Amino acid sequence: MITRKEMTRMLLKEGLLSCLANHSFESVTVTLLCKASGITRSTFYLHYSNIMEIVDDLVDDAIAYSKPGMVDNNNLQTIANTLSAASNSVSLREAYDSIFDRLPLCQRIIRHKKYLPLFLDEQISEYVLQRIIGREKDRQGLVIAESLGISFDVGVSVFVFLVHGLYAVNKQYKWSQSDEWLEAQKIIFELVYRGLQSR
């Protein structure tokens, strides 16, 4: 059974997502958030000291929803080869779905549209990306380092580059996972994999 505390936090998180659909993060005040959530300011301050704490909770929820992905030394190769084998948009979508658990966390999170407002707002999107990078960098950096024979720190740098690049492409396509977007994903993963292979 859900506790009152959990219910209140859930209402505030849903309220913030609702506010972000119509307002910039910068313009969301505690008063506006409380009105959208149907709770009082004093109740807000019993659970959070500021709105960024709700953003943190939402990112944590999105990460938990997305579940840990499959990561191994052949991850990039598996993704690139699976997508490359697709001959048309239908088989490409099927290929993408088949390797979905291997995709970087930033790609898996956006599949759940509920969390999309966190990525759409210019003021908090970089903060959200940094939280995602912080959660994944040790695991992803190590895999990249081992597969390329480079230092862990350089592996993390490659991972950060990939996350920001994929974010930029998602933003360019306005977060719609269209056939054209999917083709771009295929080319990006092929390009990165081939580039790393030539090293």
Across the structure, where does each feature detected by a protein language model lie?
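Alpha-helical bundle regulatory/interaction domains
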Residues: 1-23, 30-32, 36, 40-199
